[in-house]
Amino acid sequence: ALTALSSDLITEYKKDKESRADWEKGYTSGLDLLGFKYNDEGQPFKGASGVTHPLLSEAVTQFQAQAYKELLPPDGPVRTQVVGEASKPKQEQAGRVKEFMNYMLMDKMEEYTPEFDQLLFYLPLAGSAFKKIYYDEIKQRAVSKFVPAEDLVVPYYASDLLDCERITHIIK
């Protein structure tokens, strides 16, 4: 039974990977054009210059900086809003939730900020980026990890992660 299950899993993973082959090719070609990877093959003739313009790299860095400033302000990313009657006890509770969540994200979860920063640099390059948030039994707390789009394999035409048949996270 386990052999059949693993065989099915590998077969379906290969189908999902193949369904996004055009996206992967476009993504790696785009990185090459940005100058993130040197490759001689794309030169029009032997000895041609491989110079790329830094404008796109600068745009990526500007996006990262702006998004970081907006999404991770100095007082933390969590905001709360009271739903329904905004009584004093509810407002105080909302304040405590905000304070605790920001404390967890900015102080206890030491990986949160660098992983989020990496995600923001990657996002404009790939067009998609993901965060995997899970409870770590060893650390006894939630952990938030950046998952690059090339490491998250789903059927290419899936409209959202909640309804897709499979989600495969390639862990390197």
Name each model-derived stretch.
Residues 1-172:
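Extended, helix-rich architectural segments
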